[in-house]
Regions:
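Radical SAM enzyme [4Fe-4S]-AdoMet core and its adjacent flexible, acidic
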Residues: 2-124, 128-138, 144-151
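Flexible mid-to-C-terminal extensions adjoining Fe-S/redox cofactors in radical SAM and related proteins
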Residues: 112-113, 136-137, 141-190
Length: 190
């Protein structure tokens, strides 16, 4: 609850249990920060719930994480590498799959050295988009401020998908440059 700034942990855990019980392939993503530096404990917990695939990312300054207090919990590259090293070892021990999803946060050599084979690139408008509770379509799940592509409740999907902004973001993502478009200029995106 502290990490996301809202109550909901118990509901989230129940949702994971329900998804696993229904036979759905369930993945859990965790933004890594000083509040959950012992990510290995999180992996053990979700493994007990039946989760076998996890992703993690750096703490992205978007949405509720835009506050100074939240940004103060961000891990340095060295801290993030240490947390990931332990996470990869724990995932191997538990027979889980793990991927790091923040493009540009750690050098490719570091990720490969940790045994991570997927080197993240931005997937905005290419492999992922998201819908906010009020129906706004955003380029990715972290893109919570600024650019919206339309409203799923009121706009035709093809107008959103084929819109000029969506096409421009998708074209940039398709270059697979291992950067986050949210962080261009300040390197603080995904």
């Amino acid at each position: 609850n502290t990490l996301v700034g809202a109550p909901g942990f118990d509901d989230t855990v129940q949702g994971i249990r329900n998804a696993v019980a229904a036979g759905l392939m369930t993945s859990v993503n965790t933004p890594l920060c000083s509040l959950n530096r012992d990510y290995a404990a999180t992996l053990r917990f979700v493994h007990e719930l039946g989760v076998r695939y996890v992703t993690c990312s750096g703490l992205i300054p978007s949405g509720g994480a835009e506050t100074e207090a939240s940004q103060a919990t961000r891990l340095t590259q060295e801290e993030l590498t240490a947390v990931l090293r332990q996470a990869v070892e724990t995932a191997e021990e538990l027979g889980m799959e793990i991927d790091f999803t923040s493009p540009g946060w750690l050098p490719e050599e570091t990720l490969r050295g940790l045994g991570l084979h997927l080197i993240p690139s931005c997937g905005a408008c290419l492999s992922n988009m998201a819908v906010t509770p009020d129906g706004q379509v955003v380029p990715c799940q972290s893109w919570l401020g600024g650019t919206t592509l339309g409203n799923l409740l009121t706009d035709d999907w093809s107008a959103i998908w084929d819109g000029e902004t969506c096409r421009a973001i998708r074209a940039k993502s398709a270059k697979l440059e291992h950067i986050c478009q949210l962080g261009e200029g300040n390197r603080e995106g995904c």
